[in-house]
């Protein structure tokens, strides 16, 4: 349920874009992200930092898109969010408090060096995706960018997540692997 809720704003953005335009879709994205927060709080009685940051970014860049009638802002939002994620991961690693380990370390027990590899892998992933987003957003058509944002980046993130889980699982002890089953 939680993962489906994460896709709610993206699905609404895409559907509204297909029937209307980028501006109405940007407004719908703001509303859908707010709705996501409300539903998440009602179901889980807490709000995740990532959702709050995403809502803030969507609100700021979506509002600028609407007020200034310039789709560049909503396009930049993707890259800026990815840059913030990359920075947060890098800083957490430098401070020896890796975010990914704190999120998944209880379920997936691996050595700290493996968490460092995973962290830097995700930093690189977010940087590359942010740069590719800039290229697609400002070199190709708006429709191509929307499709890339919705399908391309989502697929890349899912693939990256699966690769990360395989890598972590491969580096777990046999005893810890048995505990997961």
From Swiss-Prot:
Look up the record and report any one GO term of the cellular component aspect.
plasma membrane
Q: Which residues form a coiled coil?
A: none
Record-linked Pfam families: IspA
| Record localization | Cell inner membrane
* Broad class of the protein's primary localization: membrane
Alphabetically sorted, this entry's keywords are:
Cell inner membrane, Cell membrane, Membrane, Transmembrane, Transmembrane helix
The source's domain of life comes to Bacteria
Q: How does it sit in the membrane?
A: Multi-pass membrane protein
Sequence intervals crossing the membrane: 10-30, 50-70, 80-100, 118-138, 148-168
What does this gene product do?
Plays a role in cell envelope biogenesis, maintenance of cell envelope integrity and membrane homeostasis.
Family, similarity comment: Belongs to the YciB family.
- The identity of this protein, by name, is Inner membrane-spanning protein YciB
Organism from which the protein derives: Shewanella piezotolerans (strain WP3 / JCM 13877)
């Amino acid at each position: 349920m939680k993962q489906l809720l994460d896709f709610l704003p993206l699905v609404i953005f895409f559907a509204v874009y297909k029937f209307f335009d980028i501006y109405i879709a940007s407004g719908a994205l703001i509303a859908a992200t707010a709705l996501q927060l409300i539903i998440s709080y009602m179901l889980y009685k807490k709000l995740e930092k990532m959702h709050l940051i995403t809502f803030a970014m969507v609100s700021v860049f979506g509002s600028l898109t609407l007020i200034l009638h310039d789709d560049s802002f909503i396009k930049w939002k993707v890259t800026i969010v990815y840059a913030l994620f990359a920075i947060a991961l890098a800083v957490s690693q430098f401070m020896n408090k890796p975010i990914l380990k704190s999120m998944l370390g209880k379920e997936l027990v691996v050595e700290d060096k493996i968490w460092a590899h995973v962290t830097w892998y995700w930093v690189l992933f977010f940087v590359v995706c942010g740069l590719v987003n800039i290229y697609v957003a400002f070199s190709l058509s708006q429709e191509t960018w929307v499709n890339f944002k919705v399908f391309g980046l989502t697929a890349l993130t899912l693939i990256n997540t699966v690769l990360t889980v395989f890598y972590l699982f491969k580096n777990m002890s046999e005893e810890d692997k048995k505990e997961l089953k």
